[in-house]
């Protein structure tokens, strides 16, 4: 085998190895991202039944933010939560999809109209966000 051919072969093999290593590291990063989001989701569940209205409101805002991040992750984009929710209609059953939109609208009322949230509303919203975020991250 000639020297130039040997050098070319070695370079091609090294490039292939680098490509494979980068793909492996990327998939590990994806697993870590999912794990972080699911851990955050679990942690937020501790606050949904709080007697403190501000904690419940903050939790709903954070849950919606987590929904947005999970949709960005799924669609590999940086679009708004609302834009990505429109794309997500095929992921969920019709009633679940509507409930998710209702939870998102509740979050908007909290942010834009300073709306209070009852414990029941907070718990129901958490249940919907949890169900949907887990499904998105599968």
Task: Locate each region found by the language model.
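Histidine-centered, metal-coordinating catalytic motifs and their short helical/loop contexts
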Residues: 93-119
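Alpha-helical initiation/capping and key positions within long helical/coiled-coil segments
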Residues: 58, 102, 121-124
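Short, hydrophobic-biased amphipathic alpha-helical segments
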Residues: 118-132
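Amphipathic, oligomerization/interface secondary-structure segments
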Residues: 85, 109-110, 123
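Amphipathic alpha-helical interface elements
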Residues: 2-91, 95-98, 128, 135-138
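A structural signal for well-ordered alpha-helices, especially hydrophobic packing surfaces
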Residues: 70-71, 107, 111-114, 133-137
